[in-house]
């Protein structure tokens, strides 16, 4: 019987897959910094309302004073730096190639969880993790058809910079999970309130960067109503829901296992891209998807 936190991590992966599909247009319209800033602001407002009115876990009162600093640091590392780096990479490489590089956050998380937190996983789960990551990378690396000339697959800017930005985003995601894990295992901590703190701190950092005059923080184009709606929907699905599901999963799950299961989002993205672009991925992509399914099953049934 799969553990609840495993299913929550897979749910986060589904949210991120859908969110990445929604993000391409508004991210390229506004630029990585402006898109992230608008997204964080909208999500922060949503999470504050949810914490004050809807959360079943106790709201702000559930957060002990000593939890605020690690939550703030986790937000700065994982959301402020990591989020911007990921969308900057996506703008340069497209969602497919940025996704395969970002999937390395699972490997970073497993190593950091072992070294820093002393987390151990069994042989079956380890084999499942290897197959899952291999499947994700196979599906994306070999998932592009030779005749695919869609704008989402085009290179924009320096490819090497895009690769480094995607790897930076992956490392930031792993570090943020490591930082926030001790907070989430504290009994009674509200994951929605914790998410609100993380996103609010990252939002303040974004606006401070804009106020400093940093040129890249300015939007490349003025936001339209349609772009803001897409940004808000993306934020609700990927950050509001996806990130909160990960925090709930971290209450009982290991950092490495949660990261591995949540990294399958690029494979879940394959059928969504098929629907969106009107053509199936290359046959090798389905081989990768098959490996991911087998690996995920080994983890769930460990």
Give each language-model segment a name.
Residues 2-16, 64-77, 124-136, 190-204, ...:
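Structural signature of hydrophobic alpha-helical transmembrane segments
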Residues 61-65, 102, 115-138, 142-148, ...:
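Loop-to-transmembrane alpha-helix entry segments
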Residues 17, 21, 48, 75-80, ...:
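Hydrophobic/small/kink-forming positions within alpha-helical transmembrane segments
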Residues 251-252, 297-302:
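Juxtamembrane boundary at the C-terminal end of a transmembrane helix
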Residues 35-36, 98, 194:
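Juxtamembrane helix-start motifs in multi-pass secondary transporters
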Residues 32-33, 95, 121, 189-191, ...:
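Membrane-helix interface/capping residues of multi-pass secondary transporters
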Residues 1-10, 14, 20-34, 38-71, ...:
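Membrane-interface interhelical linkers
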Residues 41-47, 101-115, 130, 201, ...:
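Alpha-helical transmembrane segments of compact multi-pass small-molecule transporters, enriched
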